[in-house]
From Swiss-Prot:
Keyword Manganese: no
Protein name, as recorded: DNA-directed RNA polymerase subunit beta
Job description of the protein: DNA-dependent RNA polymerase catalyzes the transcription of DNA into RNA using the four ribonucleoside triphosphates as substrates.
Organism: Hahella chejuensis (strain KCTC 2396)
Subunit structure: The RNAP catalytic core consists of 2 alpha, 1 beta, 1 beta' and 1 omega subunit. When a sigma factor is associated with the core the holoenzyme is formed, which can initiate transcription.
GO biological process: DNA-templated transcription
Keyword terms, alphabetized: DNA-directed RNA polymerase, Nucleotidyltransferase, Transcription, Transferase
Family of the protein in this entry: Belongs to the RNA polymerase beta chain family.
Keyword flag Nucleotidyltransferase: yes
GO molecular function: DNA binding; DNA-directed RNA polymerase activity; ribonucleoside binding
PROSITE patterns: RNA_POL_BETA (PS01166)
Length: 1357
C-alpha cells in the first residue's frame, strides 16, 4: 500500500474490519457535473448533447414571424473568457462570469413565390449577456460574495394516484384521485366524489364531469361506455329473453330465478347467492345461454342506442336504465338484440356511466365551450378560441412538456413497455390514466407513495439555471416575433432583432436572489462541503414550511443510502432540508442512486452497480456488515436483508446485492462522528449540525479519535492546496509554493511549472479567517493529489475542527450544572481555542448635492493623536492596532451653506470662494471591536484621480505578479537548458562562440557559455540544430506571453473601478480580531454534547491525577445517561489510550531508542490490535522517525461509523498504553489536595468552539435610536437597540405594586419624548428628578381610533 506525502507523516490506526470496496466518491461532483453539463464549455460544438444551454436554445428557436416569411434559427453558442479571475471578482465585488455569444441565422423567404423559396440568409454572432461560471470548488461568485446553489428535491413529473385518506367526506370514504404533473404546463386531475362520479380539474380550478374532457377529445357517449365497460348481450326470441352467459359475472348476485343446466338439473336455487362453487358447476356443464325472465332486465343500463329497425327512431338511448316502459317499446318494435353494461358493486362499478348522466353537454363543441368557460370565466367563447385553448393546454409543445423523466415515469406507472415518447399528452394517455384510476377504485392496483424517492427527483444547479435561461429566452421570443415582420422589409441583421436584456435579467435574478441561491456557509471546510451537498424540498416549485406535513419530513425506507436520516436542521425546516448520503449520486433522470456490490449464489463480488429507489425494490440487499469468509462467501444461515423496502432475514442464496460500506447510509457530517452507532439519533443530529458551526482555531489539531473520513473532507473541500501534477518543490515561502513538474507529466510545449499562491488571512463569509500554511520543504518530491498546504481547520491534510482536551466527568461546585462547562486557565494560556475573526469595514465617498465627499487626513476638530495612525491620504496604516472610536478612514462631507448676508456675498465675489464648511463623516471602529488592520483596498471611479495609497497598493500587486512571472520563466528556462545540456553533451560542433569545427562539447564549455551563446552553436548533427532552434523559439514565445500577461494585469489594475452611480471612491479596511475563549462562549463535542462555559479557573484549582497532571475541562456526568449519547464516553476512553501511546512513543524518542525498536512498537499499535493492518515496512527508518515524532502528542485512531472499535479493543489499547483498562483514575482536589472518594473517568475528548461567541451577543445601551412612529427604542444588537420590557414583565411589576418603577419603564425609559430628553439633561446636570408625560404610543392609539371615524379627546384633569 502506498501512502501519500502527508499520510506517511502521520498514519491513523484504523479499527475498521470491513474491506474498502469502493473509495469515497468526489464529494462535490453533484454540483460540478451538473453545471458542466449545463455549459458544455469544453465540448466541441458538433458533439454537444441536447441538455443545458444547448437544449434551452433548441427549445425556443427557430422563431418564426407572424406572417411566416421570416425565421430566426439557432446555430451554436460559445462562451468567452471571463474578464477577472475568481480572486479579482471577490476583491472588486463583481460577478465571476463569461460572456455568452450565440450564432443565429436569419432566413427571409420570398413572399411572391408559391413554394417556400429562400430570399436571403444572414448569419451573425449575438451577445446574450453573461453566464456566471462555477469555481473549481462548486461555488459561484456573485457580486463579490461566494454563493452556493442548493439542489432541490421536488415531485417528479409523471402521473400519481392517491386518495384523500378519508378526510374529505364525513363518512370516511376513500376518494381516489389521479394527477398528471408535467415538467411545465397545466396540471390535470381526475377525482372521485362521494357519489362515485369521476370529475376532472385543470390547474386546480373548479371541477367538471370527466366525460366532458372525453367529449372534448372527440369521443361520443357510446364510445366512452365501450372503452370502460364490458357488455352483457340479451337476445330476444319469441318473446323470451336469453342471456349470453359468462358464469364468473354472476358471482355474488342473488338468483331471482332458478338456474338449471341444459339437461334441466338445478344448479342454483331461487333466492340463493351465487358462489364460486356454483360458477364452477356452470362452467363444467358448459352453460352458454341462460333463459331469463324479462324482469331480470329492469335496472340494467343500455350500452348502445336501441333504434326501431323499421323507422330508425331511437327508442332507448344509450346509458339509460331499462324500465317496464322501455321493455314494452322493445317488444313492440320487435328488437332482437339488447346490449347492457356489465357492472357490479365489487370490482366493476358504474362510475363512468353515472358521470355521463350528470354531464349536460351533448357534443364536442359544447364540451369545449364548457372547458373554456371554466378556464376563462366571463369571456365570451367562440369556436376557434375554445378549440385553441383546449389544444394549447395539453397538446402543444410550446405550452406543455412532460420531459423525458415525466414520460418515463408516466409510461412505467401505466405498465407500458417503452420509456420514451412525446412530451405532450395523447388521447390514449388520458384514457389510460382514467382507466387505471377506475381500476384502483375497483380494488385492482394500489395508490402511490409520494414520499418514495422514486417519485421525488433532484433538480441540481444546471437544470435550474437552464429553466431560468429558458424563461428569459421565451421573453426574448415575444419581442423578436414582433421585430421579425420589420426585418422582412427593412433588411435588419440578427443583432438588431435580439435584445439580450431579458435573458441576462432572468439569469441574474436566479443567481442573485432565488431562494435556493444561498450565501455560502464558510465557517469551516465541513460546512462548505455540506452546504454544497444539501438537498432542499423548499424553493420555487417545491413545498413551503407551513404546508409541509409530517409525512414529507419523515425518514422513508428509500432514504437508505441516498439521503442521510440523521443530518437535518432542528426547527421549522426539519426533514425538508436534507443532506446527500456519502456515496449517493443522481442519475440522468435526476433520481438519487446508491451503489451496491453484486452477489451471485451467496458469493460477494467486487462489481458495483448503482440503483435508484425504483429499481432497488426488486432486489434482496444484504448489509455491508454481513459476515463473509475469506473467499467472499456469506456464512450465516440467515442474513439480515432489505427487500421491497422492508427489513427481514433470508438465506444467503437469495441475496442479490450487498451494501458497499456501512457509512453509505449517512452523510459526510454524520460519518465524522466516531462511535456514531452508540449515540441516540437526536443527539447525533445535533452533533452533525454543530460540527458545521465550529470556528477554525489558531492552531488546528487533528482529532485523536476520528473516523477516517477527515482526509476525504479536507481534500475535497478545496480549502487545501492539492498538487495538480507530481514533481519537485523548487521554492517555498509563506505565500506560495513552486513545483517543477516531472517530465512524464508535462505535455509538449508546456511550461512544466506549477505555481500555487496561498490564500493568506482572507475573510470568509462568516468573518472567520481563511489562511493556508505550507507543508512541504524545498527539494521534496510530491505526487499528483498530495496535500501541499493546509487550509483553515486542516492539520496535515486532515479535517481538524477543534482541539483534543483532557476532560474529567465529575461535578465541580455547581460550575457544571445543566451542561455548563468548567475550563482550566491553561486552555486560555496555550491559545487552544483562540480564533481569528476578520471584519470588513467599508467607507464610501459619494458625490452629494453640495459637492463631492473627500477622503483626507485633513479632518475638522480632530486632535493630532486621533490622526497618528493615518497616512497622508487619510487611510489607516496596515499593522495599526485599533480600538473603539479610532478613525480608520478620514472623510469629510460638504455642509449645507448658511444664508449669507449681502456684505459676505460681496466679499466672496471679490476674494473668490472661501472654503465652504465641511463636516467629519470618517469611518470609525465600532464599539466592542479591538484588533489589527491587516489589509486595505481602495477602489476609485473611472476618471477620478487616484490617491497615493491606491497607487502604492497597485504597485505592490504588480511587483508580486512580476515576481511570479519571473520565477516561472526562470524555472522554464532552467528546465530547457537542462534538456539541451543532456542532448548536446559530447556532441561535435561545426562552429560556435570560442569553438572550431570538430570540437566536442564538454561540461567546461557549458559552464563558460552565457545563456544567449547556446543558441549560436552550430552542431554537426542537423537534428540538434533543429532542437536548439525550437528551444530558442519556445523561450521567446514564453517571454512574450509573460509580458502580455503582465501588461494585461497592469491594465486591469490601473483601469478605474466600476462603482455604483454617485460613488467616487470606496475604501475597505480589514481588521483582524483575536478572540480568546471566555465564559459565555458555546462549546460542544461531536456527539451533540453542547454547553456554555461557566467559568475559567486557575490551573492550580483544577482536579489533578496521581502524576500531578491537571485536567483541562470538567464536564457533568449527568449529561450522558438521559441523553443516551454514550459515544462521548467511548471516545474519551479511546482518546486516553491514544494519548498514552503518544506519551510512550515520546519517552522512547527522548531515550533515543533505535528506529528498529520504535518500528516494533508501532507494529504492536497498528497491527497488533483489531482493525486494518498498516504496511509499516514500506517506510524507511528516517520516515519511521518522522512518523514517531508526529505521534508524540497521541496516536490518531479511526473508528469508522458502524464498523468501529469494540470495547475489548479499547481495553487492549489502554493496556498497551500502560493504563488501567477501566479508563478511570484517582483524582485530587486542586484546592484542598484531598483525594476524591471514587475514581473518575478521565480521557481525551475532541471539543469544538462554536460560532456563538459571547462577544457577538453581549450588548448594552443607554440612549440610542428610536422607531419612527411609536418612538420606542429599536430592538437587537445590530440596531443598537434596547431590552424590551414586555407584557409579562409589566405584570411582574404590577404584582409587586412597584408603581413608580412601572411608570418610568412605560414613559421616560421608553417613548415619552419630552420626558426622556428632559431627564437626560437633568442627569447631565446632576439632578435625578423626572417628569413623566404622555407616551407617544398612546398618541398613536388616539390617532388610529380617530382614523376609524371615532372622535376621542383627552380631558385636562
Amino acid at each position: 500500500m502506498t501512502y501519500s506525502y502527508t499520510e506517511k507523516k502521520r498514519i491513523r490506526k484504523d479499527f475498521g474490519k470491513l474491506p474498502a470496496v469502493m473509495d469515497v466518491p468526489y464529494l462535490l461532483s453533484i454540483q460540478l457535473d451538473s453545471y458542466h453539463d449545463f455549459l458544455q464549455q469544453d465540448v466541441a460544438i458538433e458533439d454537444r448533447q441536447e441538455v443545458g444551454l444547448h437544449a434551452a436554445f433548441k427549445s425556443v428557436f427557430p422563431i418564426v414571424s407572424f406572417s411566416g416569411n421570416a425565421a430566426l434559427e439557432y446555430v451554436s453558442y460559445r462562451l468567452g473568457q471571463p474578464v477577472f479571475d475568481v480572486a479579482e471578482c471577490q476583491l472588486r465585488g463583481v460577478t465571476y462570469a463569461a460572456p455568452l455569444r450565440v450564432k443565429v441565422r436569419l432566413i427571409i423567404y420570398d413572399k411572391e413565390s408559391s413554394t417556400k423559396a429562400i430570399k436571403d440568409i444572414k448569419e451573425q454572432e449575438v451577445y446574450m449577456g453573461e453566464v456566471p461560471l462555477m469555481t473549481e470548488n462548486g461555488t459561484f461568485v456573485i457580486n463579490g460574495t461566494e454563493r452556493v446553489i442548493v439542489s432541490q428535491l421536488h415531485r417528479s413529473p409523471g402521473v400519481f394516484f392517491d386518495h384523500d385518506k378519508g378526510k374529505t367526506h364525513s363518512s370516511g370514504k376513500l376518494l381516489y384521485s389521479a394527477r398528471i404533473i408535467p415538467y411545465r404546463g397545466s396540471w390535470l386531475d381526475f377525482e372521485f366524489d362521494p357519489k362515485d362520479c369521476v370529475f376532472v380539474r385543470i390547474d386546480r380550478r373548479r371541477k367538471l364531469p370527466a366525460t366532458i374532457l372525453l367529449r372534448a377529445l372527440g369521443y361520443a357517449a357510446d364510445e366512452m361506455l365501450e372503452m370502460f365497460f364490458e357488455n352483457s348481450l340479451f337476445e330476444v326470441e319469441g318473446g323470451e329473453y336469453f342471456l349470453d352467459l359468462v358464469p364468473s359475472r354472476l358471482r355474488g348476485d342473488i338468483a331471482i330465478f332458478e338456474i338449471k343446466d341444459d339437461e334441466g338439473n338445478l344448479i342454483v336455487e331461487e333466492g340463493r347467492r351465487v358462489t364460486a362453487r356454483h360458477i364452477r358447476q356452470m362452467e363444467k356443464a358448459g352453460l352458454k345461454r341462460l333463459r331469463v325472465p324479462s324482469s331480470y332486465l329492469l335496472g340494467k343500463v343500455t350500452a348502445t342506442n336501441i333504434a326501431d329497425p323499421s323507422t330508425g327512431e331511437v327508442i332507448v338511448e344509450c346509458n339509460t336504465e331499462i324500465t317496464d316502459d322501455a321493455i314494452e317499446k322493445i317488444e313492440k318494435a320487435g328488437i332482437k338484440r339488447i346490449e347492457t353494461l356489465y357492472t357490479n358493486d365489487l370490482d366493476c362499478g358504474p362510475f363512468v356511466s353515472d358521470t355521463l348522466r350528470i354531464d349536460a353537454t351533448r357534443s364536442q363543441l359544447e364540451a369545449l365551450v364548457e372547458i373554456y368557460r371554466m378556464m376563462r370565466p366571463g369571456e365570451p367563447p367562440t369556436k376557434e378560441s375554445a378549440e385553441n385553448l383546449f389544444n394549447n393546454l395539453f397538446f402543444s409543445e410550446e405550452r406543455y412538456d412532460l420531459s423525458a423523466v415525466g414520460r418515463m415515469k408516466f409510461n412505467r406507472r401505466l405498465g407500458r413497455e417503452e420509456t420514451e415518447g412525446l412530451g405532450v399528452l395523447s388521447h390514449s394517455d388520458i384514457i389510460d390514466v382514467l382507466r387505471t384510476l377506475i381500476d384502483i377504485r375497483n380494488g385492482k392496483g394500489v395508490v402511490d407513495d409520494i414520499d418514495h424517492l422514486g417519485n421525488r427527483r433532484v433538480r441540481s444547479v444546471g437544470e435550474m439555471a437552464e429553466n431560468q435561461f429558458r424563461v428569459g429566452l421565451v421573453r426574448v421570443e415575444r419581442a423578436v416575433k414582433e421585430r421579425l415582420s420589420m426585418a422582412e422589409s427593412e433588411g435588419l441583421m440578427p443583432q438588431d432583432l435580439i435584445n439580450a436584456k431579458p435573458v441576462a435579467a432572468a439569469v441574474k435574478e436566479f443567481f442573485g436572489s432565488s431562494q435556493l441561491s444561498q450565501f455560502m456557509d464558510q465557517n469551516n471546510p465541513l460546512s462548505e462541503v455540506t452546504h454544497k451537498r444539501r438537498v432542499s424540498a423548499l424553493g420555487p416549485g417545491g413545498l413551503t414550511r407551513e404546508r409541509a406535513g409530517f409525512e414529507v419530513r419523515d425518514v422513508h425506507p428509500t432514504h437508505y443510502g441516498r439521503v442521510c436520516p440523521i443530518e437535518t436542521p432542528e426547527g421549522p425546516n426539519i426533514g425538508l432540508i436534507n443532506s446527500l448520503a456519502t456515496y449517493a449520486r443522481t442519475n440522468t433522470y435526476g433520481f438519487l442512486e446508491s451503489p451496491y456490490r453484486k452477489v451471485v449464489d451467496g458469493l460477494v463480488t467486487d462489481d458495483i452497480e448503482y440503483l435508484s429507489a425504483i429499481e432497488e425494490s426488486d432486489y434482496v440487499i444484504a448489509q455491508a456488515s454481513a459476515a463473509v469468509d475469506e473467499n467472499g462467501r456469506l456464512i450465516d444461515e440467515l442474513v439480515t436483508v432489505r427487500h421491497k423496502n422492508e427489513f427481514t432475514v433470508m438465506p444467503p442464496e437469495k441475496v442479490t446485492l450487498m451494501d458497499v460500506s456501512p457509512r453509505q447510509v449517512v452523510s459526510v457530517a454524520a460519518s465524522l462522528i466516531p462511535f456514531l452507532e452508540h449515540d441516540d439519533a437526536n443527539r447525533a443530529l445535533m452533533g452533525s449540525n454543530m460540527q458545521r458551526q465550529a470556528v477554525p482555531t489558531l492552531k488546528a489539531e487533528k482529532p485523536l479519535v476520528g473516523t477516517g473520513m477527515e482526509r476525504y473532507v479536507a481534500q475535497d473541500s478545496g480549502v487545501c492546496v492539492v498538487a495538480r501534477r507530481g514533481g519537485v518543490v523548487v521554492s517555498v515561502d509563506a505565500a506560495r509554493i513552486v513545483v517543477r513538474v516531472s517530465d512524464d507529466e508535462t505535455e509538449a510545449g508546456d511550461a512544466g511549472v506549477d505555481i500555487y499562491n496561498l490564500t493568506k488571512y482572507q475573510r470568509s463569509n462568516q468573518n472567520t479567517c481563511i489562511n493556508q500554511r505550507s507543508l512541504v520543504m524545498e527539494g521534496d518530491e510530491v505526487a499528483r493529489g498530495d496535500v501541499l498546504a493546509d487550509g483553515p481547520s486542516v492539520d496535515l491534510g486532515e479535517l481538524a475542527l477543534g482541539q483534543n482536551m483532557r476532560i474529567a466527568f465529575m461535578p465541580w461546585n455547581g460550575y457544571n450544572f445543566e451542561d455548563s462547562i468548567l475550563v482550566s486557565e491553561r486552555v486560555v494560556q496555550e491559545d487552544r481555542f483562540t480564533t481569528i475573526h476578520i471584519q470588513e469595514l467599508t467607507c464610501v465617498a459619494r458625490d452629494t448635492k453640495l459637492g463631492p465627499e473627500e477622503v483626507t487626513a485633513d479632518i475638522p476638530n480632530v486632535g493630532e493623536s486621533a490622526l497618528a495612525k493615518l497616512d497622508d491620504s487619510g487611510i489607516i496604516y496596515i499593522g495599526a492596532e485599533v480600538e473603539p472610536g479610532d478613525i480608520l478612514v478620514g472623510k469629510v462631507t460638504p455642509k449645507g451653506e448658511t444664508q449669507l448676508t449681502p456684505e459676505e456675498k460681496l466679499l466672496r465675489a471679490i476674494f473668490g470662494e472661501k472654503a465652504s464648511d465641511v463636516k467629519d463623516t470618517s469611518l470609525r471602529v465600532s464599539t466592542g471591536m479591538r484588533g489589527t488592520v491587516i489589509d486595505v483596498q481602495v477602489f476609485t471611479r473611472d476618471g477620478v484621480e487616484k490617491d497615493q495609497r491606491a497607487k502604492e497598493i497597485e504597485q505592490t500587486e504588480l511587483n508580486k505578479f512580476r515576481k511570479d512571472l519571473n520565477d516561472e520563466y526562470k524555472i522554464v528556462e532552467g528546465a530547457t537548458f537542462e534538456r539541451l545540456r543532456s542532448a548536446l553533451l559530447g556532441q561535435s560542433v561545426i562552429g560556435g562562440p570560442g569553438l572550431k569545427k570538430g570540437d566536442t562539447l564538454t561540461e567546461v564549455h557549458f559552464n563558460a557559455f552565457e545563456k544567449e551563446e547556446w543558441f549560436k552553436l552550430n552542431m554537426a548533427d542537423e537534428q540538434l540544430n533543429e532542437l536548439l532552434e525550437k528551444a530558442e523559439g519556445q523561450l521567446q514565445e514564453r517571454r512574450k506571453s509573460i509580458e502580455d500577461r503582465y501588461e494585461d494585469k497592469k491594465r486591469k489594475l490601473q483601469s478605474g473601478d466600476d462603482l455604483a452611480p454617485g460613488v467616487l471612491k470606496i475604501v475597505k479596511v480589514y481588521v483582524a480580531v483575536k478572540r480568546r475563549i471566555q465564559p459565555g462562549d458555546k462549546m460542544a463535542g461531536r456527539h451533540g454534547n453542547k454547553g456554555v462555559i461557566s467559568a475559567i479557573k486557575p490551573v492550580e484549582d483544577m482536579p489533578y491525577d496521581e502524576q500531578g497532571n491537571p485536567v483541562d475541562i470538567v464536564l457533568n456526568p449527568l449529561g450522558v445517561p438521559s441523553r443516551m449519547n454514550v459515544g462521548q464516553v467511548l471516545e474519551t476512553h479511546l482518546g486516553a489510550a491514544a494519548k498514552g501511546l503518544g506519551d510512550k512513543i515520546n519517552r522512547m524518542l527522548a531515550e533515543q531508542k533505535q528506529a528498529a525498536e520504535i518500528r516494533k512498537f508501532l507494529h504492536e499499535i497498528y497491527n497488533g490490535i483489531g482493525g486494518r493492518n498498516e504496511d509499516l515496512d514500506s517506510l524507511s527508518d528516517s520516515e519511521v522517525l518522522v512518523l514517531a515524532a508526529n505521534l508524540k502528542k497521541g496516536v490518531p485512531m479511526a473508528t469508522p461509523v458502524f464498523d468501529g472499535a469494540k470495547e475489548k479493543e479499547i481495553k487492549e489499547m489502554l493496556r498497551l498504553a500502560d493504563m488501567d483498562d477501566s479508563g478511570q483514575v484517582w483524582l485530587y482536589d486542586g484546592r484542598t489536595g484531598e483525594r476524591f472518594e471514587r475514581q473518575v473517568t478521565v480521557g481525551y475528548m475532541y471539543m469544538l468552539k462554536l460560532n456563538h461567541l459571547v462577544d457577538d451577543k453581549m450588548h448594552a445601551r443607554s440612549t440610542g435610536s428610536y422607531s419612527l412612529v411609536t418612538q420606542q427604542p429599536l430592538g437587537g444588537k445590530a440596531q443598537f437597540g434596547g431590552q424590551r420590557f414586555g407584557e409579562m414583565e409589566v405584570w411582574a411589576l404590577e404584582a409587586y405594586g412597584a408603581a413608580y418603577t412601572l411608570q418610568e419603564m412605560l414613559t421616560v425609559k421608553s417613548d415619552d419624548v419630552n420626558g426622556r430628553t428632559k431627564m437626560y439633561k437633568n442627569i447631565v446636570d446632576g439632578d435625578h428628578r423626572m417628569e413623566p408625560g404622555m407616551p407617544e404610543s398612546f398618541n398613536v392609539l388616539v390617532k388610529e381610533i380617530r382614523s376609524l371615524g371615532i372622535d376621542i379627546e383627552l380631558e385636562a384633569n
